[in-house]
């Protein structure tokens, strides 16, 4: 069993049972939807993408770009910048903000570079009211920032708990000789402040922490 992608050279049904993955193309599309919702569907935006050739992040970026082009004609993608290190998020975002001061939104890859971009935005004198960041990968840091109304305005998340359940189920079925699909997709989830409590429960299978719930009510 594999999560997200198999090892090169291995054959499904022979060398491994199945791949269980999020729908990464849809995940990227949801990121575009969240950015459009955050900035009102119009304005100049930029994107930070993972420059290394990695199938999962490639699909997410493709989904994001395709959705922008097809669904949001009033949003102009004025700049894209690749990074090969999530810890360079602040550096990359600072350059984008300096060169394109009119951008009102940013796709910040996943949580670590996105929070670096949030720091860059703050240093540049931007506020969560005039600059929005969206990202993939739901963790405690971006969830907390979203809850308190910070720069993180939307997240497109995998459902790793449910992916784990699917992987265990598929593996168990294979052990008893039952047929198992060679590729299993778990749908992603778009998260904003409005659905954060429900989304947190869906993703982690536990309730939203009290501090985040309190921030939502402020």
Spans of model-derived segments:
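Hydrophobic alpha-helical
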Residues: 64, 78, 82-145
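Flexible loop/hinge segments that line or gate small-molecule binding clefts
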Residues: 1-26, 44, 139-148, 152
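Short, solvent-exposed amphipathic alpha-helices that sit
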Residues: 27-31, 55-75, 88, 92, ...
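Hinge/cleft segment of the Venus flytrap/periplasmic-binding protein
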Residues: 48, 52, 67-68, 159, ...
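Short beta-strand elements in bilobed, periplasmic/extracellular small-molecule ligand-binding domains
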Residues: 44-47, 68-86, 128, 187
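Hydrophobic alpha-helical segments within soluble ligand-binding/sensing domains
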Residues: 19-45, 88-90, 137-143, 159-176
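Structural recognition of the beta-strand scaffold that forms the well-ordered cores
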Residues: 1-4, 18-21, 44-49, 78-79, ...
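Extracytoplasmic "Venus flytrap"
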Residues: 49-59, 107-112
């Amino acid at each position: 069993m594999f999560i997200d992608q198999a090892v090169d050279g291995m054959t499904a049904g022979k060398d491994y049972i199945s791949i269980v993955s999020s729908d990464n193309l849809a995940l990227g599309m949801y990121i575009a939807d969240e950015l459009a919702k955050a900035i009102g569907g119009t304005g100049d935006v930029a994107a930070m993408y993972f420059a290394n050739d990695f199938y999962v992040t490639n699909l997410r970026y493709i989904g994001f770009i395709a959705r922008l082009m097809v669904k949001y004609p009033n949003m102009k993608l004025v700049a894209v910048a690749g990074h090969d290190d999530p810890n360079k998020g602040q550096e990359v975002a600072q350059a984008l903000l300096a060169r394109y001061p009119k951008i009102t939104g940013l796709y910040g890859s996943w949580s670590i570079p996105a929070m670096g971009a949030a720091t860059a935005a703050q240093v540049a004198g931007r506020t969560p009211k005039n600059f929005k960041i969206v990202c993939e990968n739901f963790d405690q840091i971006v969830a907390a920032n979203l809850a308190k109304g910070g720069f993180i305005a939307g997240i497109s998340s995998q459902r790793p708990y449910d992916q784990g359940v699917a992987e265990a189920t598929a593996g168990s079925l294979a052990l008893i000789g039952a047929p198992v699909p060679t590729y299993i997709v778990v749908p992603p989830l778009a998260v904003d402040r409005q659905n954060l409590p429900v989304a947190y429960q869906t993703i982690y299978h536990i309730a939203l922490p009290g501090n985040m719930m309190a921030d939502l009510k402020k």
